[in-house]
């Protein structure tokens, strides 16, 4: 019976996590002025680097939350915090680089790499700072 309880807990956290990632990607792509999905479909490396780094920057703290959450509502709360942190990282990079979206649209790989790296760094720091 213990294995079934473990499988149920795994399934709950995994599928809730997948749903939170999908919701995050939807919200993030609606917040940014450029259309990441279309740019990536059009082989825009800068957009791919930025969006991939952002995805990792969200999934890392979400994974930390899955490991340490004491309940499903706790997991949701930390997932929400990770989402907000990624939006703040994007806003911060745009303060530093106001033409970020235009640079990404114009295939500026350095701008895309910087955005992706900033998002990844924000996610790693976010995961490290999660306390219970």
Curated annotation (Swiss-Prot):
GO terms for cellular component: plasma membrane. The keyword Aminoacyl-tRNA synthetase does not apply. Its main location: membrane. Keywords: Cell inner membrane, Cell membrane, Membrane, Transmembrane, Transmembrane helix. It is a multi-pass membrane protein. The keyword Cell inner membrane applies. Residues 1-6, 68-71, 131-132 are periplasmic. It is found in: Cell inner membrane. The chain crosses the membrane at residues 7-27, 47-67, 72-92, 110-130. Residues 28-46, 93-109 are cytoplasmic. Belongs to the UPF0719 family. This is UPF0719 inner membrane protein YjfL.
């Amino acid at each position: 019976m213990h294995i079934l309880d473990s499988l149920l807990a795994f399934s709950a956290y995994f599928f809730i996590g997948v749903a939170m990632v999908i919701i995050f990607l939807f919200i993030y792509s609606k917040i940014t002025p450029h259309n990441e999905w279309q740019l990536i479909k059009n082989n825009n490396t800068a957009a791919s680097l930025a969006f991939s780094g952002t995805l990792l920057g969200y999934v890392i703290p979400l994974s930390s939350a899955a490991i340490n959450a004491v309940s499903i509502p706790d997991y949701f709360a930390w997932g929400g915090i990770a989402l907000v942190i990624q939006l703040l990282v994007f806003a911060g990079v745009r303060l530093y680089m106001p033409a970020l979206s235009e640079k990404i649209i114009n295939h500026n790989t350095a701008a895309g790499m910087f955005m992706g790296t900033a998002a990844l760094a924000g996610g790693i720091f976010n995961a490290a700072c999660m306390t219970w």
